[in-house]
């Protein structure tokens, strides 16, 4: 079922609340002060039922200038707008400001209602309609229906209901795939239930029992119960007004403007890259460095507007800007916002968020401007390439891209294939992509690193993988580093083993004397069996003049894996250790555990030396010690290779 929010807008005392009551039977003025003063101060909500069983939610917002802050809190989740104009007064200052706000917030559909039609004659109504048409020209309400109503006589109320029903049927359906997000416009507690927050779910869906997080502080909580218009429900979907009963958090820890979201789905930010617009009828020039009030969802923040390509933004102009906030804010790319002048407090503009987690930019940086232009209006392919490129060596998975563009995973697959074929992207591992220029830069770094290593260690088989990962991709996940190195190997640029990496054209070249030393070292270690030989003892086999060469050859044999360090300084020849591996494997084919005494007898060696070998297997993860016995370790499969 499609869920739609209809927002009321218009000047104070133009009949918005009375119109909602006529449509729904609900008096949205819930505060005693509202009843006393006869004006709406805070947000009111009502359910509008249609004859076919469908419904919509109506948000009644205050029209008085002093309560624009509250109006903005309710306008954030609006799908359709009802701009209310009293027939006896016409367009007024808050009518204009509300229309500007709805336009800035990206509302696409709606209609105009002339209330109190019974107070004026037909000629006046016709003249007012023409005036309204001229005032909404160029806005989302241009050419939209204008309906005449009177709640006192009932004129036009049913026609309005039918028009609203038709609009809801054609309203754009919201995605339920993105993680849920609910900007909080009200928080209170109820005896026996605890903390309750209300708001419009603008993304995804939320269910009873879901774990949730409150941003920007990041406090954890759980959804205990859900209501939509006073009725208990098991789940709420994007486009519905909801009351959410939260467990695990107190009312005092939550403020209006906080965002309830799926755990770990959002991160707060102190900076936003935006496309900023100064309204055509604004009386103010927004200079770079100006302080503004930023309204996003139900939140308000002070912001410093840093204009990225000019010194001042004049009425009717727009530009890229970075908003630097006084307090952290949880937002998403594509969100709309409104800005009001710092003092005097008046609406001057707004825009759309292009990057919710930017770096701090310098002004007049052409690369930044070009990047933001792609974010704003680039092709899907350009946006995809840029999104991958911004992740650097981390790259992006297919799932990341689908979430980023709010599409099922099947959608980007064809585009990714085309971009890979064009050489824009590289699939470094199944469903993980890197931008080609990033991979080229990494290869240049890798080639430089290994060339230097081979020059300094000509007898080594290559750099140890752990060292290569750390030096080339500092701080990156091992899985991603291995995928990049494997990609270089597939391209024929690298030689990879389980322990080392080397340039593809590198090989160890021994002198005649080094070759003789190598053979003697291997023969001696092979003869020593599992007891092995200490490195000092091996070097002592040679004259003093050859001991330096012996140390180099030993290092080479250890790097190639022909010799293995069983313990510090203790070398064992690989074929000897392979034979012990085979015994261990055979043992565990018929046993669940291995005791030290059993292993000692199998090797025919001392208890101390058998323990030394077992500890070597423990370190490799091949075996795992539990008390006095060993069991199979997580890496046992290595000895089967």
Question: Can you describe what each PLM-predicted range is?
Answer:
Residues 117, 123, 134-282:
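Conserved catalytic-core segments of large NTP-driven translation/proteostasis enzymes
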Residues 13, 19, 38, 60, ...:
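Residue-level signature of catalytic and energy-coupling elements of molecular machines
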Residues 55, 61-66, 76-127:
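Conserved Switch II/interswitch segment of TRAFAC-class P-loop GTPases
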Residues 8, 120-124, 134, 249-565, ...:
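C-terminal effector modules of nucleic-acid-centric enzymes and ribosome-associated factors
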Residues 1-61, 65:
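Conserved G1/Walker A P-loop phosphate-binding module
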Residues 11, 187, 204, 226, ...:
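Residue-level recognition of beta-strand microenvironments
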């Amino acid at each position: 079922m499609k869920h739609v929010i209809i927002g009321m807008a218009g000047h104070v005392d133009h009949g918005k609340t009375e119109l909602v009551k006529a449509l729904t039977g609900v008096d949205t003025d819930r505060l005693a002060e509202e009843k006393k003063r006869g004006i709406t101060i805070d947000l009111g909500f009502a359910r509008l039922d249609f004859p076919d069983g469908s419904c919509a939610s109506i948000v009644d917002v205050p029209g008085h200038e002093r309560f624009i802050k509250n109006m903005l809190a309710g306008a954030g989740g609006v799908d359709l707008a009802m701009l209310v104009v009293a027939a006896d007064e016409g367009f007024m200052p808050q009518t204009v400001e509300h229309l500007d706000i709805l336009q800035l917030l990206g509302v696409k559909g709606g209609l105009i209602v002339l209330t109190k039609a019974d107070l004026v004659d037909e000629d006046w109504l016709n003249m007012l309609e023409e005036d309204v048409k001229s005032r909404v020209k160029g806005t989302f309400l241009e050419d939209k229906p204008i309906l005449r109503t009177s709640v006192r006589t009932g004129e036009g109320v049913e026609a309005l209901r039918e028009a609203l029903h038709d609009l809801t049927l054609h309203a754009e359906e919201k995605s339920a795939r993105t993680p849920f997000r609910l900007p909080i416009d009200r928080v209170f507690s109820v005896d026996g239930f605890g903390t309750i927050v209300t708001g419009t779910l603008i993304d995804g869906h939320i269910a009873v029992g879901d774990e949730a997080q409150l941003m920007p502080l990041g406090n954890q909580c759980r959804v205990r119960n859900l209501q939509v218009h006073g009725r208990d429900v098991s789940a709420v979907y994007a486009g519905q007004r909801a009351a959410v009963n939260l467990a695990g958090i107190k009312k005092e820890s939550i403020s209006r403007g906080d965002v309830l979201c799926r755990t770990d789905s959002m991160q707060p930010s102190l900076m936003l890259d935006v496309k900023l617009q100064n309204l055509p009828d604004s009386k103010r020039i927004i200079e770079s460095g100006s302080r503004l009030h930023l309204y996003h969802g139900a939140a308000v923040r002070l912001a410093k507007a840093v204009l990225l390509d000019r010194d001042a933004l004049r009425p009717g102009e727009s530009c890229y800007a970075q908003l630097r906030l006084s307090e952290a804010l949880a937002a998403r790319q594509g969100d709309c916002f409104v800005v009001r002048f710092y003092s005097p407090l008046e609406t001057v503009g707004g825009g759309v968020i292009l990057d919710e987690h930017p770096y701090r930019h310098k002004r007049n940086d052409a690369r930044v401007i070009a990047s933001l232009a792609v974010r704003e209006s680039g092709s899907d392919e350009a946006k995809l390439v840029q999104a991958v490129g911004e992740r650097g060596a981390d790259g992006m998975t297919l799932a990341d891209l689908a979430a980023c563009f709010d599409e099922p995973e099947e959608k980007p697959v064809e585009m990714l294939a085309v971009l890979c074929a064009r050489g824009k992207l590289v699939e470094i591992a199944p469903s993980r992509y890197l931008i080609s220029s990033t991979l080229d830069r990494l290869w240049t770094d890798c080639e430089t690193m290994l060339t230097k290593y081979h020059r300094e260690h000509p007898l080594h088989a290559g750099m140890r993988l752990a060292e290569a990962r750390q030096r080339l991709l500092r701080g990156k996940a091992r899985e991603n580093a291995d995928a990049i190195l494997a990609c270089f190997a597939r391209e024929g640029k690298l030689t990879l083993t389980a322990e080392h990496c080397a340039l593809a054209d590198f090989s160890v070249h021994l002198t005649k004397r080094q070759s003789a030393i190598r053979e003697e070292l291997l023969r001696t270690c092979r003869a020593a069996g599992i007891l092995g030989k200490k490195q000092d003892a091996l070097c002592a086999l040679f004259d003093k003049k050859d001991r330096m060469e012996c140390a180099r050859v030993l290092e080479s044999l250890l790097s190639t894996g022909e010799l293995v360090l069983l313990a510090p300084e203790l070398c064992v020849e690989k074929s000897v250790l392979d034979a012990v591996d085979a015994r261990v494997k055979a043992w565990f084919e018929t046993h669940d555990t291995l005791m030290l005494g059993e292993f000692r007898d199998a090797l025919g060696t001392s208890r101390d030396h058998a323990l030394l070998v077992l500890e070597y297997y423990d370190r490799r993860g091949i075996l795992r010690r539990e008390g006095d016995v060993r069991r199979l370790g997580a890496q046992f499969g290595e000895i089967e290779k």
